[in-house]
Amino acid sequence: MKRALLFVVASSFALAACNSSTSQNAAQEQKQGGDVGIQTSWMDKSVKPGDDFFSYADGSWVKNTAIPADRSRIGGFFIADLEREKNTKELFDNIIKANPTSGTDALIANYYNAYLNTDAIDKAGLAPAKADLDAINAITNKQQLSSAIGGTLRSDTDPLNATNFQTENLFGVFVTQGLATPGEQLPYLMQGGIGLPERDYYLSSDPKMADTRNKYKAYIQTILQAAGYPDAQGAAARIMALETKIAQAHEPIEQSQDFKNGAQVWTRQQLEQKAPGIDWTALLNAAGLGSAQKFDAYHFAAIPKLSALVGSEPIQSWKDWLTFHTLNQRANVLPKAFRDASFAFNGTVLAGTPQQRPRDALALNATSGALQDAVGKAYVDKYFPASSKAQIQTMVDNLKAAFARRVQAIGWMSPSTKQEALKKVQGIVVGVGYPDSWRDYAGLQIVGDNAYANQKNVALWEYRHQIAKIGKPMDRHEWWMPPQLVNAVNLPVQNALNFPAAILVNPFFDPNADAAFNYGAIGATIGHEISHSFDTGGALFDAVGAMRNWWTPADFKNFQAQADALANQFDQYEALPGLHVNGKQTLNENIADVAGLGAAYEAYKASLGGKPAPVINGLTGDQRFFLAYAQSWAVKSRPETLRRIVLTNEHAPEQFRAQSVRNIDAWYQAFGVQPGQKLYLAPDRRVKIWG
């Protein structure tokens, strides 16, 4: 349920991403407008708000903003990330100057320096990977193959919090409370094994997909040739054939998003009986799961098919596959030929980005991602004031109260269901800025001269941390995002929310800004995350995160009718010629957008204490609220990236999320929207999920 990010630029960090005229206008407007927050220079007033509210709010910005050559898209995440990068670079510069020899600062310095030093990486060649490649080459039977596959498993998927279903390893592992075992933490087994983003990239007859497949096959061959692999062309063909079979075994994304589908618990014996082909003892022992007796078979239909492929496909094909993915996953810390080939395919073919980012920026982000708590603690100590934490906590409380009022006012919901919903709202655990406790990095080996080993060690260390939770009580206060990430998340089995520090700044939140701006921007984000607790997935969990039915049949039928109407609404949006948004695939995010926006608006009105909002720069309070929301979704994407989002992501493209205002009655009144305008919906067709 990862929240896609907002986009409201009101700071000088926009200079790096916008052309000079847009930047100068925004800076001047910020100076003149004080702390209003709305960028009127972004607006295209030639567009009627009732025809296209995204273009009305953001049209001039879209026309005048160029996507940087080293980016696949530009938007709120990237603008805010410029500040996050600036702050993190300052932190790292100070740490490295101190030349630390121990503690987390030494880990940060060593990881960063090793990643940055491409001369050393190039000089080392494939020596750091030799042991891994030799082990694959030595495989001669299915037991050894199963062990090798098990040794690659990592905690690199997350179906519940991040809706991340993709891993190059044959299976993904995720550890939390089991969907069918409240109070008991289990390892989830998930489908994996493909290098392209999603199964449709292999199976679609679309000519663009066929072209991508051809380029992927050529990329595989390039990587293997760079490694001196024998018969790289033949191996690439075998890998492509194997991955196509793996993709055919995969469950589609809509099925992956259905939590009820992922609630099957298999014992160790059932796993072996239901999914023959793999030597499960060898695989689980190598994966550190040899003592696990229960598994959440999240992709229960795919697991037997993937296991069968291990039993039926030639060992050589699997050795080819293991070799390629070992190199592909670590290409960024291998010699230049690997780095360049990886960017040419993953960066340019898949995302449309023409230019790679500077190595120091890549090193900074890689270090921040690898040592999340070490960097995060230093980050919040310096850049996140206690006053911001307190103000956001107050906004969260106001949003929760608004959501509760909206639940109480629903006419179609029975008292028993309302009682459960209110109990769930009241029980939400909210984390603002950073976690209550930090990871202990004792035992993690990070050196200053082996970036490949560092990357491997961090992934293994994180995996061992996750599987150590098996059988232990769930911590409802556990964080699933680092503080230095510009994002927010709802955690369904914890009934909890995380709002990292990096999103709680301009352009998302300004402690001195007009209430209309803050509630339209970060307030809608807070409302979105609260509302995820009541989307088609979140509504399956109760106040303590147990998956159980707390709805009456009639109530859920009414709820589903509203959800279906919203799915149909989004099905109509065309992202690229012939490529429409999938309303079912994006439904939970769309529900959270609509319900969260409604709750944020109600909380904003309550914050006025019965007083009228002032008119500022010719804009009423309601107009500023809705413009802040729409400007939070300002975005410009390369076509390749937009296609990938539509096909693989649970979020609709931002330009369509901005149009969610059409379901809010107050928006019609604020902008005089009339029948006949393109976004107009008759009152009985406006989706009213949760109020």
Question: What does each of the following model-derived ranges do?
Answer:
Residues 1-4:
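Positively charged n-region of N-terminal signal peptides that target proteins for export
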Residues 15-17:
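C-terminal motif of bacterial Sec signal peptides marking the signal peptidase cleavage site
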Residues 19-21:
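Bacterial signal peptide processing site
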Residues 24-39, 43:
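N-terminal low-complexity, Pro/Thr/Ser-rich intrinsically disordered segments
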Residues 31-34, 45-123:
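Active-site-surrounding "flap" and adjacent substrate/cofactor-binding loops of secreted or lumenal enzymes
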Residues 61-65, 196-197, 507:
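Short, solvent-exposed loop/turn elements at domain surfaces
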Residues 81, 274-277, 296-300, 361-364, ...:
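Intrinsically disordered, low-complexity linker/terminal regions across diverse proteins
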Residues 95-398:
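Noncatalytic, helix-rich "gating/capping" subdomain that lines the substrate-entry/channel surface
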